[in-house]
Amino acid sequence: MLVNARKLLIIPLFFIGWHTVQAQEVWTLKQCIDSAILHNKTLKVNQNNINISTYKEKEAKANLLPKIAANVDYNYFIELPTQLMPMNVFNPQVPEGQFRNIQFGVPHNINANVRLTMPLYNPQVYGAIENAIIANELSQLQFQKSEEQVLYDITTLYYNAQILKNQLYFLDSNWINTQKLLKNMQLLKEQLLAKGTDVSKIQLQADQLSTQKENVSNKYSSILNMLKLNIGIPMEQDVDVIAELEEQQLNHYTRENTVDFEIVKAYNKLLNNELTVLNRSKTLPTINLVASYGTTGFGYDKAPDNFLKFYPIGFVGLQLNYPIFNGTVTLQKINQKKLEISNNELQAQLIDDKNRVEIENSERQKTMAQQTIINTKNQINLAQSIYEQSILQQKQGVATLTDILLADNALREAQQNYLLAIMDYLKADLEIKKLKGIIKN
């Protein structure tokens, strides 16, 4: 809820025909926000995104672990492989350049081995790990941003519901006053002291108030449905808001970095890390440890010399891959990344400049709204007094029905302006908190 708040003076009102709203469970703003943190589906999606980023970070780190694979290969040669052998190997007197085709091997060949590969140094793997860590930070910042947005949306909906609820209270009070006036005018007509058109004018005003009440009531129900949707609770659940409005003093909040600015900074960190990885991959080699152990089998299935024999084989070694020239692909990627970093820095400056302008505008709007609240509150009291005096003067025969209707319209206009001023104030205050990065405080 709002802090450092003083309760606004709300004129005592009476309620008629609004039993449905009264029967609903009343939720405070804090209850709505606390429930949304638990049930809001947008927050659940972003929480899952954080978990996904955590697993991606673990996936990147897993590339440093050794990879072990088992391989089995069996070949049956219908035709044995043929090799060309120099004939002077068998007969030195044969001149060079003469060959003889000879088939080597046996039909059955079996190879089975276990192979291990482990990166000893790979700049791309280490860069991917650093990127995954930064991406995880970005996911958490995105969650904070969505959390703040949900808080902002729920608070705005709650304020709108409060304004509509108070508007209904005003309409109820005005409708009661109109009904009283209508009864008095009907009595005067029966006594031939008023015209039929006077009664019709008041009846028209009563009908208009009933229509306004119905429209505002429908808007109120729609706002409550949107509030339930943002909280994440079923539409069937009854929810109502506190009718009493609250107004803050003109506090000056301390400005902190907004989540949007922190996201831009984290993205800048990611871009610079990607640039570092590209520079490393251009000049540094990759080194892998490789090892293999297995067996090779040879078989012959013709009698009487059929056999199947296996011979062990194993090795340990290093693989080194050094980039010499890749067609300037890496260079072009580096140039692109530098421009992305430049755009990111410009975006950070733009966010900061825009934030300052919006804070100044919102603070000005808040100051104006607070003064308007004071003025319209006085106008309501004055309009109420004029209306009551007009009723009294009409009974004394001094004021006309037109005077009463004008006073009634002035009262309703003052009430509407009062509620609009409160809404402007609350929205401006909430916007300032959002712009200064303290909306969750």
Regions found by a protein language model. Give the residues of each.
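Amphipathic alpha-helical coiled-coil/helical-bundle segments that mediate oligomerization/assembly
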Residues: 161, 199, 216, 366, ...
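Periplasmic alpha-helical coiled-coil/stalk elements that build and connect Gram-negative outer-membrane
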Residues: 55, 143, 147-257
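Bacterial Sec-dependent N-terminal signal peptides
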Residues: 1-40, 419, 425, 440-441
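Sec/SRP-type N-terminal targeting helices
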Residues: 44-48, 61-62, 120-147, 197, ...
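Extended, amphipathic, non-transmembrane alpha-helical segments
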Residues: 167-188, 215-226, 360, 372-394, ...
